[in-house]
Each structure stands twice: as structure tokens, then as C-alpha cells.
Amino acid sequence: MYKRQTKNDAAWHGYPSISTFSSTAPSGITDLLGSFGCEHSMNAYSYHGSTLATASIFNVKYIISNKLLPESNLFNFYYGSDGEFLYENKYTLPVGFMVDSAIEDRWITNSPYNGIEVQNSFYKINTGIEDVFEQVYEFRTDTEVNFTPYTNAHMYAVVRNVNCDTVTVTINGKMYTYSGLKNGNRIIDIGYVTTEDSVILAGDTSMNALV
């Protein structure tokens, strides 16, 4: 297993991936991933900013992480080497699948800087399930916040201030840095946390964050 070098690692090493850099990247795919909250630009898009829900939609069967992930009923540890860890996603949709015809008229894809709402709308139309994700906190003007989760859950943060480019997440004293948020990947995977954990979110400016 190789450490990530570029967005074209998949082409380099010969495996399919959701990430790519190409001068001929189709704008439709770029726009779609952007609406879901993933990193995107004029000639590139990537898995950054994805959730377990979008991983399922895009048939992402394996996730390479540079940190150990908590045990989950959604994915299994598969392999690890030299600080890189491979996880198998247990629940993925096929590459092609049917959707409700109502999606053309009812799917909300223009929710500014909130791919979570777009994902909720997608699942509601196609499955009838409301609020796959539920908002539990809102921090409008804070540059740094500290909270203890009120329940055990897998949590994500959505950073809506377009001027905020770097956020650190500190869980029980261990810090993770997320940068390049101005590329559109404004969903931060906090991970699975419990009521015993301490979580600190800190941005390089006010975050206008939802959790």
C-alpha cells in the first residue's frame, strides 16, 4: 500500500477511485461532487469532504486513512502498513442504480456550502427516510468551540464561512488538521465520538459551523 501523492494515484497504481486531476474533467461530475460537499475545482475533484453516505452512493468499497478509525458496524479494518490504514466499506450501492423519477424536480442541490442537506434530500426522495443526518449544534461566529457530544454518534462538521480555509479537530488531546476548505470540501469528518469524549473545533477564522 502506497502513501497518497496526488489525486491521480489511482491511475498511477491501477485502481478505480473517486479522486482525479484532469484538464478534461467533466463539469457535470465536478458539479455533482461539489453539491454533495466534496472537494472540487475546474479540473479536479476528490473524496475529501465525503461522508459514509456519499461513499455508499459512489460505490467506494475501500477507504485509505492516515489515522486509525474507531470500530464501526459500517466498515471493517482490512490492512495497515507504514501509517496507512485500509478499511472495507460494508454497505455500498452498485456503480449504477435506479432513482425515483421525482429527483429531477424535488432534489435540492443548491444548498450553499451544505452538502449534508443535499445528501439528506437525495436519501429522502429515493428511500423515504428523512434526516439521515441530524443537526445537533450550531456555532455561527465562533473561531474555536469545545463540546462534549450529548450522544454516541458518528459526527460531521459543515464549515459554511467561505473565508475559513483550515480547521483543526482535537479529540481527547489528539489533533487532526483539515486544510484547503476553499476548494469546496467543507464537510469535516469528526468521526465516531462518545459522551466521554472532548471535541475541539478551531478555524483560522470564524467557522459558521454546523455539527
Each language-model region and where it sits:
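Conserved small/polar residues in nucleotide/adenosyl-binding loops
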Residues: 1-5
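A short acidic, often aromatic-flanked loop/helix-cap motif at beta-alpha or helix-coil junctions
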Residues: 6-7, 25-27, 83-86
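Short acidic/polar micro-motifs at solvent-exposed secondary-structure junctions
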Residues: 6-19
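Surface-exposed beta-strand edges and their flanking turn/coil or helix-capping segments
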Residues: 13, 27, 33, 99-102, ...
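Luminal/periplasmic acceptor-recognition loop/helix of membrane-associated glycosyltransferases
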Residues: 17-57
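Flexible, solvent-exposed extracytoplasmic
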Residues: 20, 54-211
